[in-house]
Amino acid sequence: PSPNLERLINWRLYKEFSKGLMTELACHQLQIGSWALRKIPEKVMGHGAITYWKDGRDVYDNVSCVYVFDDGVKMTFDSVISNKFYGLEEQIMGNLGTVEPEKGKYYFESVAPAPAFLQMVNDWENKVFDSLPFAGTSWAPETANENKGEFIIGERPKSDGTSLLLEAFVEAVITQKQPKNIAEEGYYASMLCLLGHQALEEERTLYFPDEYKIDYLNHQSVKTPEAI
């Protein structure tokens, strides 16, 4: 292709056409996060940079955003496209455990205590026996991959969810009914990713503007004098 077509072919790499990782990826994860929590966050902060891809792009190649809800719960979005070790996935983490939707698995937070022998080895490796009693550890570390988790539906998912998306689309066409709250979900996914991008650009904490709130979940629209 002609070099003159570069910006049109790779439009996702330029702020003129795209907001980069926030609009191309984060919007989907943010929608899932607010759906899972049944809440919309109140503020966002973060940082973005171009640290690896020096190919002329002007959108960030790595971003990190923290969305904060009114009760202190946080939803984070991190993307580093120069490393694919962890892939693309969501993790819903709470005091009782963790859910990984892509894998269809959940992991209980409470696990069986370490066997006495493992505890002894751990104490020895950390030289607890040479320390004062109050300085020793009272637990044995457990790496994440030792907790195998359980499948949410009792067995490994048979697909990656693509077929479910197609089935939902076909059902909407046949019944001529939109999925519930699809407009509200789409609106807030768009607003959250754009607000996150603005926070990255301005390097400051931004609150969700009252004038853009609609009647959905924990948000209420603000009635202006003209609208009353």
At which residue positions do the language-model features occur?
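NAD(P)-dinucleotide binding in Rossmann-like oxidoreductases
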Residues: 55-57, 71-161
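Active-site rim elements
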Residues: 16-23, 49-53, 78-80, 150-159, ...
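C-terminal helix-rich "cap/oligomerization" subdomain common to oxidoreductases
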Residues: 55, 154-157, 163-164, 168-228
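Active-site-adjacent bridging/hinge elements
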Residues: 2-10, 138-145, 162-170
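Acidic/polar loop patches that form or flank catalytic/metal-binding clefts of enzymes
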Residues: 39-47, 74-78, 99-102, 178-182, ...
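Predominantly a Rossmann-like dinucleotide-binding segment in NAD(P)-dependent oxidoreductases
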Residues: 1-57, 87-91, 203-205
